[in-house]
């Protein structure tokens, strides 16, 4: 079965290299969009990916690992995710799975790499899979490329740390998101 294109909240295909807000598919108490935050309740480095409780968050861009046709993002294909923002940290805005201060387990952090060039770069590969709600999707970590088995394949969900910061972590459950083009 051929993979299906990922679509935004307007039903249009999501494209590589275009800015999107990634927002909770559940409105209201489900929280807002994705942004970055430091350890504890600080906005300092290092940074992890968090869900803003109210706003649309920061713009995100998807990058293909392999050459793609028509620039369309498809379900269950390895890709890189990065924030299209400037940060005052000595790390990239690309996502990766890593340990993070104050969080037990694997956390979605910044400092990732683009493309595939060895085991370490697979920590920056995510897939987008269809979820249950209309136009909703989940992020999944399970690179198709040769990798170390140190980090298990799993979905991305929200974890409330002791400061009630909504951090993205790997878990069996999955947070459902929708994609909203920033310049609709």
UniProtKB/Swiss-Prot annotation:
A GO MF label: serine-type endopeptidase inhibitor activity
CDD domains listed in its UniProt record: beta-trefoil_STI_LSPI
Keywords (A to Z) from UniProt: Disulfide bond, Glycoprotein, Protease inhibitor, Secreted, Serine protease inhibitor
TM ranges: none
Cellular location(s): Secreted, Extracellular space
GO cellular component assignments: extracellular region
Disulfide bond sites: 45-89, 142-153
Residues glycosylated per entry: 84, 90
Family matches, as InterPro entries: Kunitz_inhibitor_STI-like_sf, Prot_inh_Kunz-lg
Protein family: Belongs to the protease inhibitor I3 (leguminous Kunitz-type inhibitor) family.
The protein's name: Latex serine proteinase inhibitor
Lineage start: Eukaryota, Viridiplantae, Streptophyta, Embryophyta, Tracheophyta
